[in-house]
Swiss-Prot record:
Origin organism lineage: Bacteria, Pseudomonadati, Pseudomonadota, Gammaproteobacteria, Candidatus Pseudothioglobaceae
Protein name: NADH-quinone oxidoreductase subunit K
Bilayer topology term: Multi-pass membrane protein
Domain of life assignment: Bacteria
The encoding gene: nuoK
Transmembrane segments annotated in the record for this chain: 4-24, 29-49, 61-81
Length: 101
């Protein structure tokens, strides 16, 4: 039987991998987006684990909202990256510093 602490350990490892990825690799925007998604997966794992072990469905409902926001984030982020690569030829973070509002 898998206990709550096992889920929390897994979630904290995934969260730490996402944080390390953000701090170590600051040059590629796609990698930064993937690390943000890892952090969201860790949060979703916590919500589902607590929801299961506490016996209510509120955490699972929150997961659906988080997944919806994450899907919108990825769609908008990849659209911006596609346009950035088409116009500038690179998706480096240094190139995005010169974006105009």
């Amino acid at each position: 039987m898998v206990s709550l602490s096992d889920y929390l350990i897994l979630s904290s490892v995934i969260f730490c991998i996402g944080l390390v990825g953000i701090f170590v690799n600051r040059t590629n925007i796609i990698t930064l987006l993937m690390c943000v998604e890892l952090i969201l997966v860790a949060v979703n794992t916590n919500f589902v684990a607590f929801s299961h072990f506490l016996g209510n469905e509120v955490g699972q409902i929150f997961v659906f909202f988080i997944l919806t926001v994450a899907a919108a984030e990825v769609a908008i982020g990849l659209a911006i990256l596609t346009l950035l690569f088409r116009n500038r030829g690179s998706i480096s973070v240094d190139v995005t510093n010169s974006l105009k509002g």
